[in-house]
């Protein structure tokens, strides 16, 4: 009876559930809702079994699933079409995993979320070469780093060995603007140094200390793509990636060159602001030094016009060059070349006066020598007077002898006395004195 009623009302049924009820089910007096409930119980058992199997998976799968992350084994790659990482240039699965590291996956599958790191970047095993990332990964660039400073150090002198007590390494922040790339690359280089990769960083001469391996190149490529999204890269970085999308080493080398150039620019500005010149060095050398600094700054985009350059040069002049500050202040359109013409004129005048001073000194010395020779020639004259005096004394003695002989008697005794008295008495002394008769 019931089956007849069901057959009568089958033409007005509007659901597949009513039409699927059979006579066997009607004879058992079983409600169709009970069948659905039984099926629901089976589904619950199946889900419970799946959950129990899921708890036996490795600890890495216990990380909360990232809704933006696609599994590297099942999901399809969707790389940006307009960025510097084109799909046709992406690494294949074998190229991205040269050593069988399944946790890397395809580079295009790497999430860009700054708040959660996928377990695929955790190296397998406790003896992994690269460190794990803490939960603070992807913090903004303005967040202070726990490491001491973010200045770049030469990788050739930096110690790239990380101690076993340092379990975590702070990753670089997310790049959020092309203008922040110079500061971001400093933190990225610091991150590589703390990750035992200081030897692959290009040195000052542009070459690394050691050769980079395939695994390290993969790690370098993936981490660079994670923390430096393509839309925030500078134009010169995009140009390098458009030629070779894996040439991260060239980007690092160019960045280091720009760091050195920035340091040179700062040094040039400080040198130009602290110029000092007093003529102690050649004017040509001073002009070459100043013009090279100005040209280097202009080539690097720091324009130094003639007015500013002349003011900086004149401020450092001293000595005889100082008056150029007052004679040249009236010339508003004075150039650096005109200022150096005046400096050269003063320098040449100084050199001319210095060359004339040694000749004057030689004349003074000649006069001194002449005076010394004159005093030496007077000594023979003084010595020549002594024989003249002796001759005069002898003449006086002779005259006295004549007078005495004319007055004496012709006796022999008197003659002997007179002869004895007329003979001069020679004294053995250094003054060569002679005593006249009658004085003793």
From Swiss-Prot:
Induction: Ty1-GR1 is a highly expressed element. Induced under amino acid starvation conditions by GCN4. Residues 429-440 have a biased composition (Basic and acidic residues). Keywords: Cytoplasm, Phosphoprotein, RNA-binding, Transposable element. Residues 299-401 are annotated as: RNA-binding. It comes from Saccharomyces cerevisiae (strain ATCC 204508 / S288c). Retrotransposons are mobile genetic entities that are able to replicate via an RNA intermediate and a reverse transcription step. In contrast to retroviruses, retrotransposons are non-infectious, lack an envelope and remain intracellular. Ty1 retrotransposons belong to the copia elements (pseudoviridae). Residues 1-93, 126-173, 352-440 are annotated as: Disordered. InterPro entries: TYA. The C-terminal RNA-binding region of CA is sufficient for all its nucleocapsid-like chaperone activities. This is Transposon Ty1-GR1 Gag polyprotein. It is found in: Cytoplasm. Residues 48-60, 71-93, 127-152, 419-428 have a biased composition (Polar residues). The gene is TY1A-GR1. The keyword RNA-binding applies. The record marks 401-402 as: Cleavage. Pfam families: TYA. Its main location: cytoplasm. The modification Phosphoserine is found at residue 416. One of its GO terms (biological process) is viral translational frameshifting. Residues 1-16, 153-165, 402-418 have a biased composition (Low complexity). Homotrimer.
């Amino acid at each position: 009876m019931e089956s007849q009623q069901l057959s009568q009302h089958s033409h007005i049924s509007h659901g597949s559930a009513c039409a699927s009820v059979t006579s066997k089910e009607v004879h058992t007096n079983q409600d169709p809702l009970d069948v659905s409930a039984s099926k629901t119980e089976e589904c619950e058992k199946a889900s419970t079994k799946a959950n129990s199997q899921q708890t036996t998976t490795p600890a890495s799968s216990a990380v909360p699933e990232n809704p933006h992350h696609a599994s590297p084994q099942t999901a399809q790659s969707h790389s940006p079409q307009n960025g510097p990482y084109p799909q046709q240039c992406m690494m294949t699965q074998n190229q991205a995993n040269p050593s069988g590291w399944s946790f890397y996956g395809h580079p295009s599958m790497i999430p860009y979320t700054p708040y959660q790191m996928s377990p695929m970047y955790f190296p397998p095993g406790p003896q992994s070469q690269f460190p794990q990332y803490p939960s603070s990964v992807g913090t903004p660039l303005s967040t202070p780093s726990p490491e001491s400073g973010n200045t770049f150090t030469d990788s050739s002198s930096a110690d790239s060995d990380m101690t076993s007590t340092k379990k975590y390494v702070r990753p670089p922040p997310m790049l959020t603007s092309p203008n922040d790339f110079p500061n971001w690359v400093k933190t990225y280089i610091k991150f590589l140094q703390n990750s035992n990769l200081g030897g692959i960083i290009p040195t000052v001469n542009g070459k690394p200390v050691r050769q980079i391996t395939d695994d390290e190149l993969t790690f370098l490529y993936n981490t660079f793509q994670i923390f430096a999204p393509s839309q925030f890269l500078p134009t010169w970085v995009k140009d390098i990636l458009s030629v070779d999308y894996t040439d991260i080493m060239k980007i690092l080398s160019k960045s280091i060159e720009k760091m050195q150039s920035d340091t040179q620019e700062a040094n040039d500005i400080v040198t130009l602001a602290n110029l000092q010149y007093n003529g102690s060095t050649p004017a040509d050398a001073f002009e070459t030094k100043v013009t090279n600094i100005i040209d280097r700054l202009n080539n690097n985009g720091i324009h130094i016009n003639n007015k500013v350059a002349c003011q900086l040069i004149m401020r450092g002049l001293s000595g005889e060059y100082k008056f150029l500050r007052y004679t040249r202040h009236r010339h508003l359109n004075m150039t650096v070349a005109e200022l150096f013409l005046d400096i050269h004129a003063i320098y040449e005048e100084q050199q001319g006066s210095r060359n004339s001073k040694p000749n004057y000194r030689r004349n003074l010395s000649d006069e001194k020598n002449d005076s010394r020779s004159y005093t030496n020639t007077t000594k023979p004259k003084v010595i020549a007077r002594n024989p003249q005096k002796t001759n005069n004394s002898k003449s006086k003695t002779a005259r006295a002898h004549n007078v005495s002989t004319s007055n004496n008697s012709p006796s022999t005794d008197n003659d002997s006395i007179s002869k004895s008295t007329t003979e001069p008495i020679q004294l053995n002394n250094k003054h060569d004195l002679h005593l006249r008769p009658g004085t003793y």
